[in-house]
From Swiss-Prot:
Key words, A-Z: Antibiotic, Antimicrobial, Fungicide, Secreted
Biological process, per Gene Ontology: defense response to bacterium; defense response to fungus; killing of cells of another organism
Tissues of expression: Expressed by the venom gland.
InterPro entries (alphabetical): Poneritoxin
UniProt-annotated location(s): Secreted
Secreted is among the record's keywords: yes
Principal location listed in the UniProt entry: secreted
Name of the protein: U1-poneritoxin-Ng3e
Any GO CC annotation of this UniProt entry: extracellular region
Domain of life: Eukaryota
Functional summary from the UniProt entry: Has activity against some Gram-positive bacteria and S.cerevisiae. Has a non-hemolytic activity.
Family: Belongs to the ponericin-G family.
Length: 30
């Protein structure tokens, strides 16, 4: 479900760092 995806994404972002988050946000806004 969506909650599971959020948990996975959250853990992944913590490992990969804020750089990935910025890239994702940039991609989402285009």
């Amino acid at each position: 479900g969506l909650k599971d995806w959020v948990k996975i994404a959250g853990g992944w972002l913590k490992k990969k760092g804020p750089g990935i988050l910025k890239a994702a946000m940039a991609a989402a806004t285009q």
